[in-house]
């Protein structure tokens, strides 16, 4: 639809090509334009709020001051298309292409195995590319900063950082940039396993073929468009206006035009970076008829330095502010830069670099956000705001009155913020900033603070004091009364005590404060004051500002400089962020193995380069189909209610709306009895799908959902927590129970009995590609083509078939690749596919359904939260004789996979321990939350934490090291599990012993103890955990697989199998198998997709057996084909593969074969409590060392050593990637990830802004992974005796949790507190309970 007349022409460049647009809608973002209008789908959409980095592109503008183009990384989802006039945009397609030339950045991230599912990879590439364009030889600190705004759920970041490090000037690992030795060959502190000349000479550590990297030459990059240079240099910048259907965008060309516009439209918001307005518009549907962009006003970006301070234009970005501050700090005396240094420190943690490149100083100040990092510092630093209007200019203070929104101290109608003046600090003045956040990077603070003190010269007497906090109210809060009462005091501990009392009395945090966590925030108020006190003492001790004749002796006689002991220095330091290092060890292939045989070699993910160039096609990258419609879902806003009515009339009148899909439109089955596709009579949770809107565009569909009127009648009870469910006896299925021996009798014959509780929070899958599906109805025979992001296309096929009441053979489901799954794209994706299919049938047109991040998190469920209770009886030696564990999981409102999860949890609960008397019981609770579902590990990560917590408690009670108690209770010899399945624990002991040796646990524990004795405010902890993970489904039918292999007459081979590529590299492994069996190179082999039309009746790709079963099926097909070719090959042994294939065709020999693997026998009899539910086990061990900040609860991961039993690895690089990714995902579960719900059951932590998965800064500083040598791993069960590693590494992340617990115990010992403490129920494992536990 054409927009109203009067729009100007928008001119910008994309990948070197000029783009001219007249009818520009101000509501369209750069991301939408790139994907929809230009077809540049390499730029991905994952969150819509600028917080995940998948849509990162490079934005270049000509800077008049430096006479050079400025290249920055930005998130395209936040950039309004209207804002691009005069800019050049570079997407991943513009960096390099497989069809033309792959750029070194793209090549290195792929060859470094830095890509798994590949959905985040284009964003990673663009962040690295923008960094190199600005800093051709970056430092490692700059590398980490550049990637802080990019999220990855698969890899664990280590290989991505490794690829970036190859460009760094200060990197010297493994021979790069002039290093003479590999780190393996250098003597050190035990970081690396024994060297190549030692007992592990058959082990290999080279995952990255650095010698194959093409060099990078910065002089060969594309030039900035000369036309844009001329536009920037034009002395007259015209005003630009762009009109859309609902919004008009005006970009004035001069300050006078801006002020006049502001006077006429004082209510219109000013938009610079769109980092606040954009996400609000997306999440809240907030629309402003007029938007004013002052980005092109030079006066608003002017920087002036005078003798009294620094004046910075309001439109300067936060990234530019960092550069401005760095320059001033380097040029000015130290005493003048106190406020500047505090600001510079705070800026390093504000959002990600992409957002800092967009967000403006003025926007940050004027937002008055509660969680502001800068406003507390600016307030205490006595910053002033230069305001301007048509009536003139005025100056106001950024003080408590401005922050509180007092009218006389704020902007008046028609005014704008022109600049911010930051005064230079004075002699004897000290300014510091503080923050504590859920994550070290790219996270809003729980609490931030700015504090300033000025002393009477030559004394310790407080002359002026200012304290401000963010995160404790609706805006930045100051404490003027407390500060006033402390004036004239000396800087002593008595003053500190008084300050804490006064501040806690003045700065009150209401229980209903945004974000809650009142007790934790009050702890931080005091912690920051204490840290401020010590930092000022440290500065005074250094006599930094003293000049003759003023000396310490001329100070007041009532006070002397204290000599800060070294032990106190730990309280002064922030937790540092380091680029991780480490070694990845795996077994070399047999020297006798033919070089063309790829099995056992670290082959790059076969889609790696396509991921890195943006050429890998995901579901929503498929081109728009003729007459395609878009679907958006209408979901419940009540947790438990009767649906009185659904009125779509208003929605149907909106432009573009084609239909409303309700349960009445379903021709077949509406889901199951307890799990409806579309709600009918009542809703059971917030987020349950009621109906769907189908419209011409996705924007129209989403906007129309708010016009569907749903009337409810609330029902009781509303059950949200496990404790509520227990109280209401609200359960989804019968109790699952296993027993061994006689626990009651055993409890009578022990030295000690302990009882305890364990809480494990929920976890969001947070696959980078949200749920999405495209349904295309065909014109005859009720046929449908479905293109989906799913782990289980056969299940989607069945669900759609039953929903539409058509045979399975009319429904074909296609899966090219999936942008991460982790269990979340098994059952729930089928539900979405069925709803979209109903829309397609009703309208007779293709329907595309793509969930945004908030919708995905709201609807699809995640990992089951757990509440566990244990009773353990043990001897003084630490030997456990009896153990009784009761587990409850929060299953949500319907059954889904909850019964299977509780079964698997109970079956695997014993972990690595042989305890003669056991009783395990488990219940799945029914609550009014969205149904929780399958998730990597399937209950084991929650359940195993219970038994390991029990072991830790036993060790504390006995005064023994936890690893000694673990060893004492481990399986020793071939034995039977609690469910009476025999296995050999030999690989478990090898992993455990290897881990202890490589990590040097005794030596490092001694060093940690010595550190702890000297450091009251920083504590270190070490933990080692073993793992026995049973692989597979507990049902024989789920272990079967099929394959189809075609050999074409040119010798090329097409392989199809029933597994789905989720990022785990299953397609790569399958081609390695086919290459070995057919004896042809990988370059002749290809996998196109997974389709229910080629391989029917497939099993979900899950339970870590995808490569096992599909590998056997591919092997079977290839062996069939090779057997057919053998007579021809024997007749012509010198012939080529192509000649043999051609001869077979001439002799009418079939060159197509199916393969089939019947699977493993697996069963479980719950009545008898016995069976053989799993075909084999994966074993492993992990040791982690952490350091915690006792004042804030923050931690740093110093080192992790992992040893995994991978059998005979098909591809060590892929398997190590699975281990590292699972480990970090597990560390996230146990330490950073939090799901919060309102009392009404609404999800509060939706999207990456609130829900924090691990970032690159969360990787251990030293991360060593070893795949156990496979000498004794031969088994006929799996393909080439390999083992599935997709899930098992998840639990090893708990080693971080227990290391933190060990450090907290050390801190509590110092303070005379009990060591055996219970982690609070709220936010188990995050920094909040750790801080409170120490306090």
UniProtKB/Swiss-Prot annotation:
[2Fe-2S] cluster 1 binds at residues 47, 52, 55, 77. One of its GO terms (cellular component) is cytosol. The active site is at residue 1287. It is found in: Cytoplasm. Detected in kidney, Harderian gland and olfactory mucosa. Residues 242-427 form the FAD-binding PCMH-type domain. Residues 8-95 form the 2Fe-2S ferredoxin-type domain. It comes from the Eukaryota. Its EC number is 1.2.3.1, 1.17.3.-. Binds 2 [2Fe-2S] clusters per subunit. Binds 1 FAD per subunit. It is an enzyme of class 1 (oxidoreductase). FAD binds at residues 270-277, 351, 360, 364, 373, 417. SMART domains: Ald_Xan_dh_C, CO_deh_flav_C. It catalyses: an aldehyde + O2 + H2O = a carboxylate + H2O2 + H(+). Mo-molybdopterin binds at residues 116, 154, 821-822, 1103-1106, 1218, 1285. GO terms for biological process: xenobiotic metabolic process. [2Fe-2S] cluster 2 binds at residues 117, 120, 152, 154. Keywords: 2Fe-2S, Cytoplasm, FAD, Flavoprotein, Iron, Iron-sulfur, Metal-binding, Molybdenum, Oxidoreductase. Its cofactor is [2Fe-2S] cluster; FAD; Mo-molybdopterin. InterPro entries: 2Fe-2S-bd (IPR002888), 2Fe-2S-bd_dom_sf (IPR036884), 2Fe-2S_ferredoxin-like_sf (IPR036010), 2Fe-2S_ferredoxin-type (IPR001041), 2Fe2S_fd_BS (IPR006058), Ald_Oxase/Xan_DH_a/b (IPR000674), Ald_Oxase/Xan_DH_a/b_sf (IPR036856), Ald_Oxase/xanthine_DH-like (IPR016208). AOX genes evolved from a xanthine oxidoreductase ancestral precursor via a series of gene duplication and suppression/deletion events. Different animal species contain a different complement of AOX genes encoding an equivalent number of AOX isoenzymes. In mammals, the two extremes are represented by certain rodents such as mice and rats, which are endowed with 4 AOX genes, and by humans, whose genome is characterized by a single active gene. Belongs to the xanthine dehydrogenase family. Oxidase with broad substrate specificity, oxidizing aromatic azaheterocycles, such as phthalazine, as well as aldehydes, such as benzaldehyde and retinal. This is Aldehyde oxidase 2. The lineage of its organism: Eukaryota, Metazoa, Chordata, Craniata, Vertebrata.
């Amino acid at each position: 639809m054409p927009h109203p007349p009067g729009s100007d022409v928008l001119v910008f460049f994309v990948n070197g090509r000029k783009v001219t647009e007249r009818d520009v809608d101000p509501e369209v973002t750069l991301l939408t334009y790139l994907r929809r209008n230009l077809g540049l789908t390499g730029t991905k959409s994952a969150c819509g709020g600028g917080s995940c980095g998948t849509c990162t592109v490079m934005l270049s503008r000509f800077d008049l001051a430096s006479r050079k183009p400025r290249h920055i990384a930005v998130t395209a989802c936040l950039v309004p298309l209207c804002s691009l006039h005069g800019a050049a945009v570079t997407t991943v397609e513009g960096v390099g292409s497989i069809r033309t030339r792959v750029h070194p950045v793209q090549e290195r991230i792929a060859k470094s195995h830095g890509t798994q599912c590949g959905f985040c990879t284009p964003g990673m590439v663009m962040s690295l590319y923008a960094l190199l364009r600005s800093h051709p030889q970056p430092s490692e600190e700059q590398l980490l900063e550049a990637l802080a705004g990019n999220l990855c759920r698969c890899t664990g970041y280590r290989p991505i950082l490794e690829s970036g490090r190859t460009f760094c000037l200060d990197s010297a690992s493994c021979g790069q940039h002039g290093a003479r030795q590999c780190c393996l060959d250098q003597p050190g502190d035990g970081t690396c396993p024994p060297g190549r000349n030692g007992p592990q000479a058959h082990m290999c550590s080279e995952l990255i073929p650095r010698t194959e990297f093409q060099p990078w030459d910065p002089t060969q990059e594309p030039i900035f468009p000369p036309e844009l240079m001329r536009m920037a240099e034009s002395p007259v910048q015209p005003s630009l206006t762009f009109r859309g259907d609902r919004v008009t965008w005006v970009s004035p060309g001069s300050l006078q035009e801006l002020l006049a516009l502001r006077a006429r439209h004082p209510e219109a918001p000013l938009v610079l970076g769109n980092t606040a307005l954009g996400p609000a518009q997306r999440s809240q549907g907030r629309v402003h008829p007029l938007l004013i962009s002052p980005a092109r006003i030079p006066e608003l970006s002017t920087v002036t330095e005078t003798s009294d301070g620094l004046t910075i234009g309001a439109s300067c970005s936060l990234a530019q502010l960092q550069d401005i501050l760095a320059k001033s700090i380097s040029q000015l005396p130290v005493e003048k830069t106190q406020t500047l240094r505090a600001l510079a420190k705070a800026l390093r943690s504000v959002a990600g670099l992409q957002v800092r490149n967009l967000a403006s100083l003025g926007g940050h100040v004027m937002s008055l956000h509660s969680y502001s990092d800068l406003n507390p510092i600016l307030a205490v630093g006595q910053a002033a705001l230069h305001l301007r209007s048509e009536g003139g200019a005025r100056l106001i203070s950024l003080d408590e009155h401005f922050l509180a929104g007092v009218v006389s101290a704020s902007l008046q109608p028609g005014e704008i913020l022109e600049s911010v003046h930051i005064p230079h600090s004075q002699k004897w003045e000290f300014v510091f900033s503080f923050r504590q956040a859920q994550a070290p990077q790219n996270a809003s603070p729980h609490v931030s603070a700015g504090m300033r003190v000025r002393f009477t010269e030559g004394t310790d007497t407080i002359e002026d004091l200012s304290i401000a906090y963010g995160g404790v109210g609706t805006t930045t809060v100051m404490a003027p009364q407390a500060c006033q009462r402390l004036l004239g005091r000396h800087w002593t501990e008595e003053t500190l005590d008084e300050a804490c009392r006064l501040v806690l009395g003045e700065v009150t945090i209401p229980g209903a404060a945004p974000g809650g966590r009142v007790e934790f925030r009050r702890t931080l108020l005091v912690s920051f004051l204490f840290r401020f006190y010590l930092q000022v003492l440290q500065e005074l001790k250094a006599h930094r500002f003293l000049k003759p004749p003023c000396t310490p002796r001329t100070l007041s006689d009532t006070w002397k400089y204290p000599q800060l002991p070294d032990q106190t220095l730990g309280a002064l330091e922030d937790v540092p962020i380091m680029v991780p290092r480490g070694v990845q060890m795996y077994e070399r292939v047999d020297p006798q193995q033919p070089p063309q045989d790829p099995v056992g070699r670290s082959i790059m993910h076969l889609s790696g380069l396509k991921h890195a160039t943006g050429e890998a096609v995901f579901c929503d990258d498929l081109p728009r189909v003729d007459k395609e419609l878009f679907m958006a879902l209408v979901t419940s806003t009540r947790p438990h209610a009767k649906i009185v009515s659904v009125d779509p009339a208003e929605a149907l009148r909106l432009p573009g709306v084609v239909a409303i899909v309700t349960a009445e439109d379903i021709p077949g089955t509406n889901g199951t009895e307890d799990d409806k596709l579309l709600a009918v009579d009542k809703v059971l949770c917030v987020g349950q799908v009621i109906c769907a809107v189908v419209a011409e565009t996705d924007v129209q569909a989403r906007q129309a959902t708010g016009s569907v009127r749903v009337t409810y009648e609330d029902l009781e009870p509303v059950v949200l927590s496990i404790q509520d469910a227990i109280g209401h006896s609200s359960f989804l299925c019968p109790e699952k129970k296993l027993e061994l021996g006689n626990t009651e009798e055993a409890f009578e014959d022990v030295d000690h009995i302990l009882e305890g509780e364990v809480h494990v929070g929920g976890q969001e899958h947070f696959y980078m590609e949200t749920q999405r599906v495209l349904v295309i109805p065909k014109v005859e025979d009720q046929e449908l083509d479905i293109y989906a992001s799913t782990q289980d296309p056969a299940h989607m096929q069945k669900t759609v078939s039953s929903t539409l009441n058509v045979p399975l053979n009319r429904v074909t489901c296609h899966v090219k690749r999936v942008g991460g799954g982790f269990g979340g794209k098994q059952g729930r994706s089928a539900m979405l596919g069925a709803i979209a299919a109903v829309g397609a049938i009703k309208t007779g047109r293709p329907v595309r359904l793509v969930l945004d991040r908030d919708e995905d998190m709201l609807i699809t469920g995640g990992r089951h939260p757990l509440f566990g209770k244990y009773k353990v009886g043990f001897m003084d030696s630490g030997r456990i004789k009896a153990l009784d564990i009761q587990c409850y999981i929060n299953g949500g409102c319907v059954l889904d996979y909850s019964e299977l999860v509780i079964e698997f949890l109970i079956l695997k609960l014993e972990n690595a321990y042989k305890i003669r008397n056991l009783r395990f019981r488990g219940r799945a609770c029914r609550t009014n939350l969205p149904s929780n579902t399958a998730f990597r590990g399937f209950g084991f990560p929650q359940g195993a934490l219970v038994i390991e917590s029990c072991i830790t408690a036993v060790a504390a009670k006995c005064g023994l090291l936890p690893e000694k108690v673990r060893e004492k209770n481990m399986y020793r010899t071939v034995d039977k599990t609690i469910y009476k399945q025999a296995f050999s624990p030999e690989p478990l002991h090898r992993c455990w012993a290897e881990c202890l040796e490589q990590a040097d646990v005794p030596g490092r524990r001694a060093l940690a103890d010595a550190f702890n004795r000297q450091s009251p405010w920083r504590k270190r902890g070490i933990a080692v955990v073993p793992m026995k993970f049973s692989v597979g489904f507990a049902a024989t039918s789920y272990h079967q697989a099929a394959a189809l292999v075609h050999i074409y007459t040119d010798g090329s081979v097409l392989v199809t199998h029933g597994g789905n590529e989720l990022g785990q590299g299953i397609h790569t492994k399958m081609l390695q198998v086919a290459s070995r069996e057919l004896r042809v190179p990988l370059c002749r082999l290809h996998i196109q997709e997974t389709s229910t039309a080629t391989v029917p009746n497939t099993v979900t790709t899950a339970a870590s057996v995808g490569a096992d079963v599909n590998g056997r099926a591919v092997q079977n097909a290839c062996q069939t084909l090779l057997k057919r070719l053998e007579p021809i090959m024997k007749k012509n042994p010198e012939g080529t593969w192509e000649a043999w294939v051609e001869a077979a065709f001439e002799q009418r020999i079939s060159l197509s074969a199916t393969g089939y693997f019947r699977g493993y026998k697996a069963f479980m009899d719950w009545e008898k409590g016995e069976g053989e539910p799993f075909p084999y086990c994966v074993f492993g061990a992990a040791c982690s060392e952490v350091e915690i900040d006792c004042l804030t609860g923050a931690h740093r991961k110093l080192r992790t050593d992992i040893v995994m039993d991978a059998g005979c690895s098909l591809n060590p690089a892929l398997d190590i990637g699975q281990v590292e990714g699972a480990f970090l995902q597990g560390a996230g579960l146990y330490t950073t990830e939090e799901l919060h719900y309102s009392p009404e059951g609404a999800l509060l932590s939706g999207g990456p802004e609130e829900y924090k998965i691990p970032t690159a800064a969360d990787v251990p500083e030293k991360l060593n992974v070893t795949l156990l040598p496979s000498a004794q791993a031969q088994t006929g069960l799996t393909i080439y005796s390999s083992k599935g590693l997709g899930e098992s590494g998840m639990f090893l992340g708990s080693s971080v949790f227990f290391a933190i617990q060990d450090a907290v115990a050390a801190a509590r010992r110092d303070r005379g507190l009990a060591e055996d403490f219970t982690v609070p129920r709220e936010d188990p494992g995050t920094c909040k309970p750790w801080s409170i536990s120490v306090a």
